[in-house]
Amino acid sequence: MNSEKIFYDILNVAAENVDLEFNDKKYNQFIQYKDLLKDWNGKVNLTAITEDEEIIKKHFIDSMKIFQFEYLRKANKIIDIGTGGGFPGIPMKIMRPDADIVLLDSLKKRINVLDDILNKIGINDVETIHGRAEEFAKNPKYREKFDAVVSRAVANLASLSEFCLPYVKVGGYFVALKGPAVDEEVKIAKKAISILGGKLEEIREVEIEDSDLKHNLVIIKKIKNTPKQYPRKPGTATKKPLI
């Protein structure tokens, strides 16, 4: 069986597992995305994962697994905070072209690369933002305007909640993709989540078939407005998390 058929089948099964349609257009966008990631990665650090099958499993399918949380299959307005190489935001957009998706990253070079990738894979309705999450969360255009915020960023959950929850409208969700050992991190972050207007709803384990990768979806519901003093000045949430 050739690699093209293998990759199509892997992606198709992942889509079926989250009840989303998969087709040739989506497949071709994923393959173009993979190739462009590899081309750009020598110039701008986007990913430590460079093998084709690993990119598909550990970036694309891992991102698609976020749709195991059913709310994200229907949410209209979604922002990906600290998107890096475009994960999970671009795979989400490929799978849900109807969604209004925004990508934010603090590194201008990465945003320029993502603009190039999006253009070349035929997606022209994603907003990309270069800047600090703490600064744009104060902007009325973005503050509490999103049905969902997603992030695969490496910050601890208390800090990440301060970056992300201010963007979520009341009744919406913040979904963090975290590693396998998340219970202690969640316990430490509960104070921050509460202060910022959130409530932990669920921790959902995610496994990638035929892979050593394990993740947890930490699902936090926004139940009240974030106090206006949050997020604090850039860098504060990292240095002095609300714990």
Swiss-Prot record:
Top-level taxon of the source organism: Bacteria
Keywords: Cytoplasm, Methyltransferase, rRNA processing, S-adenosyl-L-methionine, Transferase
One GO CC term on file: cytosol
Binding site for S-adenosyl-L-methionine: G82, F87, A133, E134, R152
Family annotation (Gene3D superfamilies): Vaccinia Virus protein VP39
Subcellular locations according to the entry: Cytoplasm
PANTHER family in the cross-refs: S-ADENOSYL-L-METHIONINE-DEPENDENT METHYLTRANSFERASES SUPERFAMILY PROTEIN
Name of this protein: Ribosomal RNA small subunit methyltransferase G
